[in-house]
Structure formats: structure tokens, C-alpha cells
Amino acid sequence: MNNTSKIASYFLFPCLLYCVIVMSFVLFRGDRSSSTSKSIQKVYKSVVGIHVIQNVDERYDFQSFWDDYMSKKTIENMGSGLVLSEDGYIVTNYHVIEKASKIFIKTYNGLQYEVDLNNVYVDKLTDIAVIKINVEDRLYIPNIGDSESLVVGEDVIALGNPLGLFNASNKLTATKGIISALNVGFGFNKSSGSVYQDMIQTDASINLGNSGGPLLNLNGEIIGLNTFVISGSDSRGSIGLNFAIPINRVISIYSDLRDKGFVDRQFNTGIKVREIDQVLSQYLRLNSTDGMLVVDVEKKSSGENAGIEIGDIILEVNKVEIKTLNDIERVINEDLLKTGDNLEL
């Protein structure tokens, strides 16, 4: 090899190495963009900020018996929402808009809409609400995923309006984490009147104002509705224990609220039961007081059609042991049963 060839080799090798490094960096950036960033880009136009004004009654101790002396206290609340139709149907959490006297929706492009409260439909039991706004231009709707196909450890992204930042700056906040657990159940919450069952747990940071915003996977598909956090005693912010309602349930409730304005849970099995106390147990020569005794079955009812007869003892409902009337009510609530659903006795 002559001197010219040696010089060319010495020059070309660093250049080639530099090109490989640059190309690797570009590819790395491309890979990063194709997962997290591109997923956010697919969804962010469908996320809205919600500003709620609530007028609540405030009593003073020495006036507690005189309604005429109650004053009105104005409270402002922030939340997030997700567009589910081009013509302006938005889903959020019920607790975000509870007791609202005014609701304002802000879209990704900075447009603000005041909501007609007659166009708000709620299901307190599932903590889901649907809002309709009147829009001139079509809104962007996201791709919906399948919350039944999720796996623990899967990467997820939370989008929303924490602490009202979106309302203030027109910029959504994104946080990333994994699915920490699936099918997490908290049962019926008496204070809120809502049931939180089969929740998605994630460590993607969720804070005040994120409620009602989407949880999405790295395909840019919505898999849940961010709902609440469990915080330490000294904090109201996220400590990595965050929970979302599975999107399959959200879509089911959304469809009922949009089409009918309510979720129909006014059903009647036609079965009347009573608890079995010690006296009744001895009279019937039973071995325990477990279960409910059937004392009447209405004609042509679903109970009669199922073959239930007077004198039967119901020991389980939907595979849950029954000992009191409250147990039956708890199963109906926690299973989020609607008219037309089946009960297994």
C-alpha cells in the first residue's frame, strides 16, 4: 500500500465511524419517537381540559337549623376528558363534574365551550359521565383499545390536565409508566356512591386534574380512564398508586348514557327472600343460618322462568356467598349489573 492509500484509509475510517455513530443516533431517536411520542401524537387532539364551577351550600354552626341563613360557596374544580365522537360527545369521571353549576370544555387548539347542563349524563355507580358540546368543526376521536388484552408490565401513558395546567397553558401533560396490576377491586364506596372494580393500576403519574383523562398504550390506543390515586397521608399527589377504569367498561356505560341518557338498573327478578335466623333455621331443620329463604316468586317473572320456587334457599349469587340481604345488594352493585344481565344463583 502506497502512502496515498494509507492517508486515504486513515481519513476514511474516522469518517465511516462518524457516519455509523450519527446514523445509530438518528435510528435511536426514530425508535424513541415511534413508541412514546407517536402514541401521544395519535391521541392528544382528543383530550380536553374541564373547568367546573360548583355552588355548594355552606352552613354555620349557630345557623344549622335555619335554611334561610345558608350561604353559597363557590368552588372551582379541574379535570380532564376524552372526545369519543366527532360531533362533541366527551367522556369523563362523574366526580369531576358532580354538583356543577357551570362546566367549561377546552380543546387542544384553545377553543372553549360552555356546556349546557341539560347535555350532561351521569352514572354515579361507575363514576362515569358524558358531556355533549355543540361544535361547528368535527372533533378528533382516538383509537380505542381492548382492556381485556392488557398485561402487567406493559408500558402506558397518562394524558391530562393536572392542576389545571392545560387550561392555563394550552399544553397537555404526559406521564409514562407501566401497568402495575390488573383487576384491582375496591368494592362499593359508600361515601362516593361509586363502585371501583377490576381497575387498572399504574405508576404513570396522575395528579389532581388528571381524572377523566385517557390512559393509552404504546400503539396510541385508549385502554383506560384515569380516575383516582392513593396518596400518602402528607400528600394529595401521586406516589405511584394510580388507578384507571378499563376502557371496555367506559365504552359500555358511554353507549348507554349517549343513547338513553341513563344506565337502566331498574330490574325486578320477582323473587322475595328473607334472612334465616336461628329460630327459622331450627324450624326448617337446617344446619346453619346461611343463605336467603325464598318466600315468594311472582308469576311470569325471570325468577319463575329460572325455576326458582318458594322454599328454595339461595346460598350464592354470582359465586359470592350470601348470608344477609346486604350481601345481595353488594353483589348487584359491585358487579355493576344492568337490566338484561344474568344472575347466577
Regions found by a protein language model. Name each.
Residues 85-167, 251, 322-323:
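Conserved active-site neighborhood of the chymotrypsin/trypsin-like protease fold
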Residues 45-51, 81, 88-92, 117, ...:
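Terminal peptide-recognition signature
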Residues 73, 77-81, 141-146, 199-216, ...:
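Gly/Ser-rich catalytic serine loop of serine hydrolases
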Residues 27-90, 96-104, 109-114, 125, ...:
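Glycine-biased strand-turn-strand hairpin within the trypsin-fold
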Residues 59-74, 120-127, 168-170, 182-200, ...:
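Gly/Ser-enriched beta-turn/beta-hairpin loop segments
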Residues 1-29, 38, 118-119, 151, ...:
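C-terminal recognition in membrane/secretory proteostasis and scaffolding
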Residues 80, 86, 99, 146, ...:
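Short, flexible surface segments
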Residues 100-102, 139, 159-176, 185-212, ...:
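Active-site loop architecture of trypsin-fold serine endopeptidases
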